Amino acid sequence: MKSMDPIIGASSRILRSTPRKLNLVADLVRNKKVSFATVQLRFCEKKAAGLIGKVLNSAIANAQYNYGLDIDNLYIKEILIGKSFTLHRVCPKAMGRANRVSKHYSNITIKLRQIV
């Protein structure tokens, strides 16, 4: 039998950060209350914290305006960090040589659920 409480989500694609760096920050707030997670992300000094914080704020806004839910009763059910595409660039070196530089991109999906 399905539960009646909704699962609210928000996602962001094509973020200029590697999935590994995003996962380090996502592990801090996975399965935590939304109020605790926003404070953790606000005081975390990593760039990935700002990217995850924006997606989390979007999910909170979806919960408030689309479902009329209270923020205090929400927790982060799951955070999915996925690999997107990789751009390859060339960095010139000495004596006519060149190295490749990989610029990695990621996708984030956050799903919230109401505490029952």
Swiss-Prot record:
It comes from the Bacteria. One of its GO terms (cellular component) is cytosolic large ribosomal subunit. The keyword Transcription regulation does not apply. Pfam families: Ribosomal_L22 (PF00237). Coiled coil: none annotated. InterPro entries: Ribosomal_uL22, Ribosomal_uL22_bac/chlpt-type, Ribosomal_uL22_bac/org-type, Ribosomal_uL22_sf. One of its GO terms (molecular function) is structural constituent of ribosome. One of its GO terms (biological process) is translation. The keyword Iron does not apply. Keywords: Ribonucleoprotein, Ribosomal protein, RNA-binding, rRNA-binding. Belongs to the universal ribosomal protein uL22 family. Part of the 50S ribosomal subunit. NCBIfam families: rplV_bact. This protein binds specifically to 23S rRNA; its binding is stimulated by other ribosomal proteins, e.g. L4, L17, and L20. It is important during the early stages of 50S assembly. It makes multiple contacts with different domains of the 23S rRNA in the assembled 50S subunit and ribosome. The globular domain of the protein is located near the polypeptide exit tunnel on the outside of the subunit, while an extended beta-hairpin is found that lines the wall of the exit tunnel in the center of the 70S ribosome. This is Large ribosomal subunit protein uL22. The lineage of its organism: Bacteria, Pseudomonadati, Pseudomonadota, Alphaproteobacteria, Rickettsiales.
